[in-house]
A protein has these predicted regions:
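Conserved beta-strand in the GNAT
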Residues: 54, 60-69, 73-76, 81
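Conserved acetyl-CoA pyrophosphate-binding loop and the N-cap/start of the following alpha-helix
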Residues: 86, 90-98
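Short amphipathic alpha-helix that is part of the acyltransferase structural core
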Residues: 2-39
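C-terminal "cap" of GNAT-fold acetyltransferases
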Residues: 17-18, 109-154
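Residue-level recognition of the GNAT/N-acetyltransferase active site
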Residues: 83, 87, 120
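A short helix-loop-beta-strand connector motif used in the catalytic cores of GNAT acetyltransferases and
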Residues: 44-54, 111-113
Length: 154
């Protein structure tokens, strides 16, 4: 898989890569009550992604996923959204497996890559079904986060 426009159709769901636009991204985020972004934040987020994919049902967007990272050592599933009306139908699994295949296509021979994510509380079992492990483990510490705000002058 290269960074290209691609399409896959499974069970009346079309998956298109690198065709997610700002308005669709913002709309899907809103439908799952995620934090509101400015259009500029959304545009930059999409432009700086390694890949974006969007799931369509009857030509309507019902889900999306977005990957960021360096494409060599670490890739990160940054967003995975499925609108509530179609959750539980396997669309999230389709998108996540697509992302895993994409990341695998980037691995240099003889090396490995970490595919990371932070899941919403209560969604751990979904990701564990797809081979992800919860941290901390015996060898890996906990994931951490720091929220940054605009620096105030003065």
């Amino acid at each position: 898989m290269n960074r290209r426009e691609d399409m896959m159709e499974v069970d009346m769901i079309q998956i298109k890569d690198n065709q997610l636009d700002v308005q669709t991204y913002l709309s899907l985020r809103e439908k799952v009550n995620w934090k509101k972004l400015s259009e500029e934040q959304a545009r930059k987020a999409l432009e700086n992604s390694l890949i974006t994919i969007c799931a369509f049902q009857e030509e309507q967007p019902v889900g999306m996923a977005r990957m960021v990272g360096d494409g060599a050592v670490i890739c990160y599933v940054q967003d995975l959204i499925i609108i509530p009306e179609v959750q539980g139908q396997g669309i999230g699994s389709m998108l996540l497996e697509y992302m895993k295949r994409y990341a695998q296509s980037l691995i240099e021979p003889g090396t490995q890559m970490m595919l990371d994510l932070m899941c919403a509380k209560g969604r751990e079992s979904f990701y564990e079904k797809h081979g992800f492990i919860a941290r901390p483990t015996e060898n890996l510490g906990p994931g951490m986060i720091c929220y940054l705000k605009e620096k105030q002058e003065g």
